[in-house]
UniProtKB/Swiss-Prot annotation:
Induction statement: In adipocytes, up-regulated by rosiglitazone, an insulin-sensitizing drug.
Biased composition (Pro residues): 75-89
A GO CC term assigned to this protein in UniProt: collagen trimer
GO biological process assignments: neurotransmitter receptor localization to postsynaptic specialization membrane; postsynaptic density assembly; regulation of synapse organization
Record-level Gene Ontology MF annotations: identical protein binding
Gene that encodes the chain: C1ql3
InterPro entries linked: C1q_dom, Cerebellin_Synaptic_Org, Collagen, Tumour_necrosis_fac-like_dom
Tissues of expression: Highly expressed in brain and white adipose tissue. In gonadal fat pad, expressed at lower levels in adipocytes than in the stromal vascular fraction (VSP), which contains preadipocytes, fibroblasts, endothelial cells and occasional immune cells. Expression exhibits sexually dimorphism, with higher levels in females than in males (at protein level). Tends to be up-regulated in adipose tissue from obese males, but not females. Expressed in glial cells.
UniProt keyword terms in alphabetical order: Collagen, Secreted, Signal
Designated name of the protein: Complement C1q-like protein 3
Record's signal peptide: 1-20
The C1q domain, residue ranges: 122-255
């Protein structure tokens, strides 16, 4: 733009009677100081005092109403664990637990013998039997005492004549067998435990037709053991309800 002015206007004309003058285009003074060192009139240098005095004075008004609550901020980080709370009340009573294992044997008692308590009697199993012989037997066979009077626990079987143990312990057995004689022979009756003779008895026919063979035992039995009376020759009397021949037993105490 400056180059264009230099080419088109080579000379500037100055006018007399004015404080402004023109110089050659391109000089610094024309561009930077067109008024020739004189100050240009200014209309904004002096403020208007009347205008400033007419402006109103602002006074602080009363406090306004509280604004509406703002929205909830973001969730903060977890706090530190609090102190333990107070101990709560006891809970309800629980169900009974399972029965514990037996404890060790107690210390021996005093020298004086004490009486057997009623609790001891109640703990002994109820096992006892008593039966008579109705049918006659002879030779070598198991006597089947089929006239049963007592059979607590049902451990005696009249169809086989055998007592079968189900509770281990000490047992007592006794038997009385009436011999049927008259021909000069003798009779043997054995008490057996599992095919082993544990007691024997003999009745002989000398001057009378009848004689007894009797015996008793105390045995320790295990579950499954069998006890019975077996003839080992001769004849056993039977055939009525008088129970001349009998077999009985009971438990003394369990293991």
């Amino acid at each position: 733009m400056v180059l264009l002015l230099v080419i088109l206007i080579p000379v500037l004309v100055s006018s007399a009677g004015t404080s402004a003058h023109y110089e050659m285009l391109g000089t610094c003074r024309m561009v930077c100081d067109p008024y020739g060192g004189t100050k240009a009139p200014s209309t904004a240098a002096t403020p208007d005092r009347g205008l400033m005095q007419s402006l109103p004075t602002f006074i602080q008004g009363p406090k306004g109403e509280a604004g509406r609550p703002g929205k909830a901020g973001p969730r903060g980080p977890p706090g530190e664990p609090g102190p333990p709370g107070p101990v709560g009340p006891p809970g309800e009573k629980g169900e009974p637990g399972r029965q514990g294992l037996p404890g060790p044997p107690g210390a021996p008692g005093l020298n004086a013998a004490g009486a057997i308590s009623a609790a001891t009697y109640s703990t002994v199993p109820k096992i006892a039997f008593y039966a008579g012989l109705k049918r006659q037997h002879e030779g070598y066979e198991v006597l089947k005492f089929d006239d049963v009077v007592t059979n607590l626990g049902n451990h005696y079987d009249p169809t086989t004549g055998k007592f079968t143990c189900s509770i281990p312990g000490i047992y007592f057995f006794t038997y009385h067998v009436l011999m049927r004689g008259g021909d000069g022979t003798s009779m043997w009756a054995d008490l057996c435990k599992n095919n082993q003779v544990r007691a024997s008895a003999i009745a002989q026919d000398a001057d009378q037709n009848y004689d007894y063979a009797s015996n008793s035992v105390v045995l320790h039995l295990e579950p499954g053991d069998e006890v019975y009376i077996k003839l080992d020759g001769g004849k056993a009397h039977g055939g009525n309800n008088n129970k001349y021949s009998t077999f009985s037993g009971f438990i003394i105490y369990a293991d």
